[in-house]
Amino acid sequence: MRSSYQPVSTTNFEHENAIPTASSSHNLLMSQRFDDSPPSSNDNSIETNITPPPEPPSYEFDIEDPHDDLHKRTHLQRVSIGFQEKILEPLMENIIHPLLQISKFVPDKADYYLSKIGNPFILRRFFYIIFMSFIAYYVLSSGYLFNEKASGSKGMFSQHDILFEYAKKSVDLAKFERDLEYISSMPHGSGTKGDAAIYRYIQESFDNNGLKLVKEMGYSVYSNYPGNVSISYYDNKNEKHDLELSKENFNPLSSNGKLSKVSLIYGGKGTTYDLQHLKDSKTIEDGKDYVLLLQYDKLVSQQVLIAEKFGAKAVIFISEPYGENIDVVQSKPVGLPQYSTGDASGLNWDGSPVEEKDHKFWRQTHIPTIPISTRQGKELLSRLSSGGVTVDDGNSDRSNSGKMGDVLIDVDLQTNVREKHFIPNIVGKIEGREQSDKAIIIAASRNSINFGTTYPNFGTAALLSIVQLFQEVKYKFGWKPLRNIYFISFGGTEFNYAGSSELVEQRLTPLKDEIYSLIDISQLGIPFAEKYENGKTRGELSIETHPLLKKFFNRNAHGNFDISVDNVQHYGDWTPFLANGIPVSVISSDSTRNRDTPTETSEDKFERVEKILEDEQNQQSVKDLLVYLLHISMELIDDPLLHFDIISYVEDIDERLQRLEQAYPEKLNFTSIIKGLLFWKKIGSEWASWTQGWENIVWSHGDGIEPSLLSINRWTWNKKLTNIGRRTCSPAGLPNRSFYKNVLFGPTLIQEDKSKNGGNVDFWTFPGVMDAIYDDDWKRAQEQIDLIGKVLHQSAALFVEETNDIGYK
């Protein structure tokens, strides 16, 4: 910093002896001169009268105070000394020095003892190898390294037992309950606002679980919804009494209609036997209008068909009670899947009309149907006289049918019809890593005009949980299935299975090429465990499947469930797949399959299931069920060899053929079918032999490593196996029911036993033959037998000769 003091000039001597300044940027000026020698006397003449300045000059310099540096250094020294005294010295004294002493003592002691055995230098290395081997084993077995256990694989294929063990720990029952609660929070009939909310929820769940493809596939189909409904009856005094009805008194796909003062007749379960009995007794007569009062049977659409056949103008169904609650109403669909499933408008998916000859086979009833409660049914029954005949209720009870004119009723049903209404399916996909042109479908129905907790919501919640389990296994182990998996939530179930049917109709060829199995879980419920004598508890599951897969399901029975396996025996969203030869499997709980109350009523709410799930045993049953579903689906999609057992397939058909022959002896010639089965049996033996050889090479000796040539052979076998089902179809379909192409497996038009032995008839095998027998047309029955034999032989020949993927067009 510059001083305000201005210096005067000095001599060179003075400059050389000047004291340096504190700052190099300034000049220190001297106000006096210094002389080394004393002054001489000769200099007295020189006067040095120099007057000092009145005030000393002011200097402003930036000079650091050395005391500050000293203070800082002292503080750091104190910290350093404190750290050394309190931490380093105790650490050295109490830990490091003892450890060093031990490290010197232990080797010396070890060498001392080892020297008694042998050379310590060699023995020390020997024990070191053992110790390090133990460490390596622990690390490898713990899964910290990326080995077979950590990756869930062995060689080229997955080790499912490892994946399942992880899945057992990953089941999120809380998520299952949350999904079930939300889906059950509102009625969600097809095409309603409730359905829109639910299918968006499912779509978001698919997205959140990271499915590669999530797609909404919508279709415009005929649908109807609750509207105006009324039933009135007249007493002996001709006074009119109204039944109190609501929107719950509704059968989806019922026709609209209005009747005035028509006789009411009670018909029990409405079987052909019941109504023929009424007709023989003149209780009902041709040309006279009447309304049938019926108890619900297992197959409601068949009741409607028979009622139409006998001239009924409307049907009133009496609901089953729910415990002591006799006011619940069961809203069962009345579409007619016997002729075909799908859009009930009579139009094909592309809008073209159905052929004229098929108009009478539309999928919708032609008469009004209305469900009422048990209480209301009793009220109407009490008005019938003792005239007419006694009719079996099907519940070990009998009631009077009444007679014409006993009770007159008015019926008015006006539903809200939408000729073309949007119905969506939600599709998600996990892509396979090997044969990505082949896939299975895991599906569940979505819609209910009520809350639908038991059916179908339980199955939908299970579907979402299975998706989550698959993805958790995928992310944990880097797992991918060998083949594709599709997850589908079907819409339009109450409208004659419109969603699944339209999907099959629009994409039939790609589906037949890719899909080799469909698993439907719509009818699942809590598998309530029953206690046995040995103290174990086991729930029950019913599996209806294709004969090719029967051995697979019997072999993979779950230790906590009693599983019964049979052929498919009822309608559902799987029906259009079955009709076109695609093997299907339906996993059900008996109570849900039979639609026991409160299913299909307004009482089927989440609160009831929530209380059931408070029991730990029921919680465990649900967890076991989800793991079992994951197990069977993973085995189907990720095992190298398809689980299609041809010998079991042949034996099953042969067994059902024998039943048919016993039911109708000396009526039909089954030689052509037997020849076809023998051809398939030979193929089955070759497949079993090849399978055994493959397992010996890959698993027994190859440790999961498959040679390339063997892989190609395996893919060829798998592809040929997937064509078995589709090749049992006839392009023309069944007589009068062209929708059903599968000549081996499918529904009989009317499922009533007319055999002599009774009770031993299968209504879902050889449907064309059974239709002809029901009509007493034995010539047509033999033609259908011969057609089945021809199809079996041709499909076997194609299997042997096949080089390309050939199917009926």
From Swiss-Prot:
Subcellular localization is given as:
Membrane
Q: What does the record give under GO molecular function? A: carboxypeptidase activity; metal ion binding; metallopeptidase activity
Q: Where is the composition biased (Low complexity)?
A: 37-50
Topological domain, Cytoplasmic: which ranges? 1-125
Question: Which keywords belong to this entry?
Answer: Glycoprotein, Hydrolase, Membrane, Metal-binding, Metalloprotease, Protease, Signal-anchor, Transmembrane, Transmembrane helix, Zinc
| Any one GO cellular component localisation term in the record | membrane
Bias (Polar residues) occurs at 1-12, 20-30
Known EC number(s)? 3.-.-.-
Q: Which InterPro entries match?
A: PA_dom_sf, Peptidase_M28, Peptidase_M28B, TFR-like_dimer_dom, TFR-like_dimer_dom_sf
Classification via SUPFAM superfamilies: PA domain, Transferrin receptor-like dimerisation domain, Zn-dependent exopeptidases
Tell me which family the UniProt entry assigns to this protein: Belongs to the peptidase M28 family. M28B subfamily.
Miscellaneous comment as given in the Swiss-Prot or TrEMBL entry: Present with 300 molecules/cell in log phase SD medium.
Q: What is this protein called?
A: Putative zinc metalloprotease TRE2
| Biological source species | Saccharomyces cerevisiae (strain ATCC 204508 / S288c) (Baker's yeast)
